Amino acid sequence: MSHEAVWQHVLEHIRRSITEVEFHTWFERIRPLGIRDGVLELAVPTSFALDWIRRHYAGLIQEALGLLGAQAPRFELRVVPGVVVQEDIFQAAPAEAPRPKLNPKYTFENFVVGPNNSMAHAAAVAVAESPGRAYNPLFIYGGVGLGKTHLMHAVGHSVAKRFPHLKIEYVSTETFTNELINAIREDRMTEFRERYRSVDLLLVDDVQFIAGKERTQEEFFHTFNALYEAHKQIILSSDRPPKDILTLEARLRSRFEWGLITDIQPPDLETRIAILKMNAEQRGLRIPEDALEYIARQVTSNIRELEGALMRAIAFASLNGVELTRAVAAKALSDIFAPRELEADPLEIIRKVADHFGLKPEELTGSGRKKEVVLPRQLAMYLVRELTRASLPEIGQLFGGRDHTTVLYAIQKVQELAESDREVQGLLRTLREACT
């Protein structure tokens, strides 16, 4: 991990621990110079800033480095006059935070598509190509950290590039509510309504939080109607489908269901490895396959935690001056994750899949090529690969001594089917639950 990336992670921890005024005053102008012998070197603009940071924030910086895996967290401050400092370090925080902007990291190009998110991705691409005409509104739901916000921002970037004249607004439900409260208090409702009802693409994150807020629901109802009737595109994200959002007004629920509702599921093992590979490549790093697979097997819940685990492993290796191997990754994550044992026995997976299809296990592992056996066998190979540590050659041996290329073909075939066939997606979920 580069020294800039290490410092960014340190800043994220510090920002959660102090006030915004403190952060902007003392940390916004610090610049990382490099990492030498495990010591993070930082540039500050004045000797006064150096002394103040050393006396008041040294422990916080060391704590942040320790969380990244540094065994002996150390940093060094150096005065570099060229580093710009705020003119007024006692400047008050702005009355209103700047409006959210699209995250430049969230694009279609770096969104890893897998069986868990293929439909949501396809719908988002369709909307980006023809906003206001395809799937309006588009409602994307799924657990925390699975890529809903990434897809929304990706649509925003794509629309901005294709249709630069269109006005785009991204907002979280919390921000929408807070701005509404401020607008009511300051008698600026006309301005508030104009802001949201004059856009061509409205992206609303975490819309489940609108539930139970009567005035917010009332205002959003009219905003939704104004945009929909003008054929403007609306994209909503939530952690659950509209029917499961308790205390959501029926009229809003019905409107959320007017367009397309699509979900994002947790990524399977192959998709998690692909996500880690892309993250590593974006940072110009080549990480051994077995190290990536180890991390992918430890973090199964969501992409945000998966990427966080990778960053921790990279930082641990960088700060301790070692190569990132499987063993180093295990050490870096040891205090967060207990080593995950095999989640299922390969033979048990084969038996469960055979039972589901009314077959005998030996029919799946045998050489028969009957049509009714081919797909169950491919599904069994796929699940053994996902739910155990068995290598491709080992899986081949389980299935009658088949070549590893045959196993790889079966896995890829199931992935292709799952991307386009919701029945196969559901079948995989059912079998996965039965096997774990």
From Swiss-Prot:
Its main location: cytoplasm. Residues 101-317 are annotated as: Domain III, AAA+ region. Pfam families: Bac_DnaA (PF00308), Bac_DnaA_C (PF08299), DnaA_N (PF11638). Residues 80-100 are annotated as: Domain II. Coiled coil: none annotated. GO terms for cellular component: cytoplasm; plasma membrane. Residues 1-80 are annotated as: Domain I, interacts with DnaA modulators. Plays an essential role in the initiation and regulation of chromosomal replication. ATP-DnaA binds to the origin of replication (oriC) to initiate formation of the DNA replication initiation complex once per cell cycle. Binds the DnaA box (a 9 base pair repeat at the origin) and separates the double-stranded (ds)DNA. Forms a right-handed helical filament on oriC DNA; dsDNA binds to the exterior of the filament while single-stranded (ss)DNA is stabiized in the filament's interior. This is Chromosomal replication initiator protein DnaA. It comes from Thermus thermophilus (strain ATCC BAA-163 / DSM 7039 / HB27). The gene is dnaA.
